[in-house]
Amino acid sequence: MPSRLLVSLVLAGVLAPFAIFAARDAAYHFGPRKPGAAENLVHLTLGASQVLFIVGAFRANLAQELLGLVSIAVFGVIDEFFFHRDLPPAETDLHAKAHMFLFAFVAVALALNHLPPLLTSWPPSWSAS
């Protein structure tokens, strides 16, 4: 199993592009398009959900990661469905890149934190003998 230091360094590297595009997206909201109070509340909750997952990923806490992911899914759907229709192309591009890099971080975090124990105990105990 990789050391926690190595895992943390890899996670930080994979997180960096998401942080950059999320910051650019947030900055965009202070310029060309200013969201209303309801959208800002959804964004605040979505950001808190992302922080919950990210902290859980660095702690390798599966319960915290899953709670963060469920919250991201719920508030992400609300954000996209109700507030992100007919966005300017520049903002759509920022969202697409932020989503892609968040997905990459989620995949890497779950793989590094939870896949090695499954691989080292093959076959899994739940499989037929």
Specify the residue positions occupied by each region the protein language model found.
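Core segments of transmembrane alpha-helices
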Residues: 42-55, 98-106
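Non-cytosolic membrane-interface motifs at loop->transmembrane helix junctions
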Residues: 35-39, 88-97
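C-terminal ends of transmembrane helices
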Residues: 22-34, 77-89
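Hydrophobic alpha-helical membrane segments
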Residues: 67-81, 98-107
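Interfacial loop at the N-terminal end of multi-pass membrane proteins
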Residues: 26-48
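N-terminal signal-anchor/start-transfer transmembrane helix
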Residues: 9-29
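Helix-coil boundary and interhelical linker segments in multi-pass alpha-helical membrane proteins
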Residues: 1-13, 51-67, 105-128
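Alpha-helical membrane-associated segments of multi-pass integral membrane proteins
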Residues: 91-109, 128-129
